[in-house]
Amino acid sequence: MEISYYELLEITQNADKETIKKAYRKMALKYHPDRNQGDKEAEDKFKLVNEAYEVLSNDEKRAIYDRYGKDALKGGGFGSNSSGFGGFEDLGDIFSSFFGEGFGSSSRRRKSSNDEKIPSDFIFNLKLSFKEAVFGCKKNIDFTYKCSCKTCNGTGAKDGKLQTCPKCQGRGQVGVSQGFITFAQTCPDCQGSGEKASEKCSDCKGLGYNESKDSVELNIPEGVDTGMKLRVNAKGNILKNGTRGDMYVKIIAAEDDTFIRDDDDIYIEFPVFFTQAILGESIKVPTIRGEATLNLPKGAKDGQRFVLEKEGVKDVHSSRMGNQIVQISIKFPTSLNDEQKELLEKLSESFGIKDGMHQEQKGLFEKITNWFKS
């Protein structure tokens, strides 16, 4: 079932124009491509939100939509404005009207020819074992960085000469039609600069940069985890002016077969024999640093959790220690010899279990029988 324009903007059908405008601003920000790079679902939602606003902000189109539905607006029902934004030249303009020049019109979104073709910083993904992440380690890594081409001054053009991009006519953006709406996107030929090399630099093959290799020894601190980033100063890309950015090392920590990590806490499921759970006992359990004593109380239950304080991971930013949580799994024998079977039968009888039924079970059956008789 197709979602309505009102549902897309999360408003009621009697919403006024100001409410529609505020709702559009909220949803457009939520699904804007700059905030959801690579998210196809968000991109589709963004297009639908713009489509909904275009209709509901126009009294005539809204009236047609309310009465006949979306299909009635197809086939020229949107008037003569081919942009589909009712007076806005492109997507940059519509955002500029709502959010100010920070989102930029088409002229503001165009990159300057003086812009760098490479960012100063970059991310390096570093895989660590479970133990390396928990206890820290030293790592020698080899990496590749980019250096702005000196031959063309980072332009990618022979002799550094650029011409106006013929595809976007120097605007840095091109229009892409989606049904009855035209969206603006960065020009694929000039990457938004509005300028293009008439002849590529032979040194960098038109890229504007060359690649070089480097290496560095890293001291990985104790307690890092997946997603954390460590900054390595002055190991990033080299820009036109000679400034070198930073490299950010992103940690990807492996999982362990025995221990489960949740931030600084460690979880483990540990088997306990049923007699140990019934009688209570001090048992040894493995920890990330060796072993620790767990005092099982009498009558411990299957799945019950116990906390071993400060047996977890050290916090990467302080001296605080996490805990280890032990969840017990009660195990029962799968086979018995004659002596064991006899002992268990005697134990069962000592608890008042006769004819395969415990006294509490008998009481329940009697209660149900009386219920049927009443």
Swiss-Prot record:
**Which prosthetic group or cofactor does it need?**
Zn(2+)
| Domain (J) ranges | 4-69
Q: Name one GO biological process term.
A: DNA replication
What Gene Ontology cellular-component terms does the record carry? cytoplasm
Q: Report each CXXCXGXG motif repeat as a residue range.
A: 149-156, 165-172, 187-194, 201-208
Spell out the family assignment given in the record's similarity comment: Belongs to the DnaJ family.
Q: How does it assemble?
A: Homodimer.
- What is the recorded name of this protein? Chaperone protein DnaJ
The protein's organism comes out as: Campylobacter jejuni subsp. jejuni serotype O:23/36 (strain 81-176)
Encoding gene per record: dnaJ
